[in-house]
Amino acid sequence: METDFQPKRAHFNHVKDTSSMNMSSSPSETHQGTEQKQEAVSTFTKLRAKLSFDRMVAMGAKMGMPNPLFLCADRAAKATIHINGKDYINFSTYDYLDINTHPEITAAVTEAARVFGTSAGASRLVGGERTPHHLLEEAIAKFMGTEDCIVYVSGHATNVSTIGFLFGPRDLILYDQLSHNSLAQGARLSGATKFPFQHNSCDDLERLLEAKRKDYKQCVFSMDGNIPDVPRLIELKKKYNCMLMIDEAHSLGILGEHGGGIREYFNVDPGDVDLWMSTLSKTLCGCGGYIAGHRGIIQYLKYGSPGFVFSVGMPPVIAVACLTALKIMEREPERVKKLQHISRYFLEYARSKGLDTGESQGYAIVPIITGESMFTGFLATQLLKRGIYVMPIAFPAVKEGEARLRFFLSAAQTEENCRTAIDAIIEEIPHVRQILEKYKAEHPQTAGE
């Protein structure tokens, strides 16, 4: 049986307006229900965020700028990505070690689907536990050097559910100001008192610990992003009797000689960190996330963490895919070396051309900071026209004035492709600036919104 995986184009004007559909046998009830629905829709369309979004779309349309988001690829993304019949140089996905679609993974997943099907069928706590879950958690714990591990079906939910469950109103959470949204959401959900500290600044973190720690029953601080000073963090954890959580979603398989992440990079005792978090969607080519750490904490999470207890278990086929990818990563450290080389090459070439790469250290993700959100979006569109696919990242994901093109590097990428992309940016910047200046002159009332 053939399966058609070709994307079907969706248009907003094809969405049915159901406000006038007769859902009741009573005409008066139907009329009243319609009025309520129309009032709710009207209220939504007047929200400030919705109006801002509408203005952005309108400005893009006036400038002839197509939406660079939600473009649908019809096959796996590698060094190139295939969209609407055309190949683009791909800097938009994080298959860092070029393991996705590896024949071993494909074969293992095929067999797992035959044996286990495609769903766990229930929460793991009450009937959804499958052999691949155990094998994956055991393998990750062994790789990380920890006592135990728990895997969640979502990387975002891993942080939100873990932090939200473990901490409460009597606790203190200190987090890097550039932490991922999931860390901030988890802190908010917990009800704990929370304070951000300056990005990667252990000095600012200690200032907060000195001032705040004594007032709270329990304290945790978390780090992610650029390579933090983990040995110093461990010192602070012990000095102030805190818990330490490290999110290394973008360091597993990237840092260290064998891809062991921050732990291998600094050669620290994994037991000195209470909660090691990472995702399974990047170097391990699946989806979900994990927490690795002390057995007591992990077991507590398995019996109470809402994102684990009240969610269906990870599909067994995904667990098998991640387990197989981990084995390949451990067996083929040359993939890690290739990723590290191409990342440094991209960073050094970009800087040699005078581009702003921020605090990037050349590990898998390199930003090209361009400033204004509209400028960045239009620059991404111009690059797309030239066959280069890279995502614009703008407010609120980053601060106003710090919009950027975010380049994901992978072991599949080439030096030639890196040069092509960077040279294209240099050529397009003055062109995009001219287009924006013209637009602002013609639309002075909307250009600054």
Where on the chain are the PLM-derived regions?
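N-terminal "arm"/small-domain region of PLP-dependent enzymes with the aminotransferase-like
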Residues: 2-39, 45-116, 242
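PLP-dependent enzyme catalytic core of the Aspartate aminotransferase-like
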Residues: 2-11, 15-18, 103, 107, ...
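Conserved PLP-binding active-site segment of the aspartate aminotransferase-like
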Residues: 56-57, 92-95, 327, 364-374, ...
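Conserved PLP-binding catalytic core of the aspartate aminotransferase-like
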Residues: 69, 336-347, 351-387, 397, ...
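Conserved N-terminal alpha-helix of the aminotransferase class I/II PLP-enzyme fold
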Residues: 107-154
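PLP-dependent aminotransferase-class I/II
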Residues: 169, 176-217, 334
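Active-site phosphate-binding strand-loop segment of PLP-dependent enzymes
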Residues: 195, 199-246
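Active-site C-terminal subdomain of aminotransferase-like
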Residues: 240-243, 250, 255-362, 372-375
